[in-house]
């Protein structure tokens, strides 16, 4: 098994790379969700320069890189502990796959550990998430991260930094649980349906870096797409509560307002952008993470 340092570095590098590369999709999603009407094209045309697509990159990069490092490290600790307990009970060695050095667990264990790790880390990183969303939005004209933090603290207090944690947790915990479950399942299913000519093995009987990266990244993209679609309504509600806290105060009032005063389909607002971003982000982050931790064995 890779060291804890390896998981921290792998998670940080993967999260940072995906955050910087995909920030434009995140910004467009935030601005599209804050509007009651309009189209994605109108959102794009409202930008003054192409560089505005990367507004909020710093808080996004901090949140995603640190959050990814903490999440993947804590997830690994929990999954490894469960695997070692099973090893102790059965006197077997910890099982890993040909494309991965991560321990293999049951579907239920993958679901629970993924959800719990994400919920915990999500709470820790909630303040930077609030700053990121406000910074990306056109409803606030913050000139710096420091100004955003001071404004939130002065006007809303400490609670302002945790605004919308309920729907955020309802989005992220189920998403991560479903993601880990599907990801681990697909890593073992894909090799059985891919042409044998594409599956290259090294001298130790494991997949080569090219093959394992292709399998892991494809599994990540497919898993993220499915989990993102299921949890999309919570993302819309979370964004509304964080952008307009005086108008959208609770989960249920926000949901009711969107459905009755706008349109039920609006709870899936920004799904196409989030779907694209989450799928690509997972493919990049987990592909990098899986390969980096192999160097810390």
UniProtKB/Swiss-Prot annotation:
Solcar repeat placement: 5-81, 105-189, 211-295
Superkingdom as given in the UniProt entry: Eukaryota
InterPro entries per the UniProt record, alphabetical: Hem25/SLC25A38, Mit_carrier, Mitochondrial_sb/sol_carrier, Mt_carrier_dom_sf
GO cellular component, one term: mitochondrial inner membrane
Reactions catalysed according to its record: glycine(in) = glycine(out)
Subcellular location(s) of the protein: Mitochondrion inner membrane
Major subcellular site: mitochondrion
Keywords: Membrane, Mitochondrion, Mitochondrion inner membrane, Repeat, Transmembrane, Transmembrane helix, Transport
Residues spanning the membrane: 8-33, 56-82, 111-136, 164-187, 215-241, 270-288
UniProt cross-references to Pfam families, sorted A to Z: Mito_carr
GO molecular function: glycine transmembrane transporter activity
GO biological process: glycine import into mitochondrion; heme biosynthetic process
SUPFAM superfamilies reported for this sequence: Mitochondrial carrier (SSF103506)
Membrane topology according to the record: Multi-pass membrane protein
Stated role: Mitochondrial glycine transporter that imports glycine into the mitochondrial matrix. Plays an important role in providing glycine for the first enzymatic step in heme biosynthesis, the condensation of glycine with succinyl-CoA to produce 5-aminolevulinate (ALA) in the mitochondrial matrix.
Protein family per UniProt: Belongs to the mitochondrial carrier (TC 2.A.29) family. SLC25A38 subfamily.
Protein name in UniProt: Mitochondrial glycine transporter
Provenance organism: Candida glabrata (strain ATCC 2001 / BCRC 20586 / JCM 3761 / NBRC 0622 / NRRL Y-65 / CBS 138)
Organism lineage: Eukaryota, Fungi, Dikarya, Ascomycota, Saccharomycotina
């Amino acid at each position: 098994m890779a060291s804890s340092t390896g998981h921290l570095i792998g998670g940080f590098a993967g999260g940072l790379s995906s955050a910087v590369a995909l920030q434009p999709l995140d910004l467009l999603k935030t601005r599209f969700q804050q509007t009651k009407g309009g189209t994605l094209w109108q959102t794009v045309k409202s930008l003054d320069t192409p560089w505005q697509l990367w507004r909020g990159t710093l808080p996004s990069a901090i949140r995603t890189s640190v959050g990814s490092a903490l999440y993947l490290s804590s997830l690994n600790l929990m999954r490894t502990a469960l695997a070692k307990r099973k090893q102790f009970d059965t006197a077997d060695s910890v099982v890993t796959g040909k494309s991965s050095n991560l321990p293999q667990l049951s579907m239920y264990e993958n679901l629970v550990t993924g959800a719990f790790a994400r919920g915990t880390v999500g709470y820790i990183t909630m303040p930077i998430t609030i700053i990121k969303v406000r910074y990306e939005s056109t409803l606030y004209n913050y000139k710096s991260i420091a100004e955003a933090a001071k404004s939130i603290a002065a006007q809303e207090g400490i609670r302002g930094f945790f605004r919308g944690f309920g729907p955020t947790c309802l989005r992220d915990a189920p998403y991560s649980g479903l993601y880990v479950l599907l990801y681990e399942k697909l890593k073992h299913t894909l090799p059985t349906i891919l042409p044998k000519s594409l599956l290259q093995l090294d001298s130790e009987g494991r997949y080569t870096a090219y093959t394992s990266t292709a399998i892991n990244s494809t599994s990540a993209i497919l898993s993220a797409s499915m989990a993102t679609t299921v949890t999309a309504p919570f993302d819309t509600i979370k964004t509304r509560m964080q952008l307009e806290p005086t108008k959208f105060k609770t989960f249920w009032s926000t949901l009711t307002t969107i459905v009755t005063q706008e349109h039920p389909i609006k709870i899936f607002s920004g799904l196409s952008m989030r779907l694209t971003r989450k799928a690509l982000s997972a493919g990049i982050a987990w592909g990098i993470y899986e390969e980096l931790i192999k160097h810390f064995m």
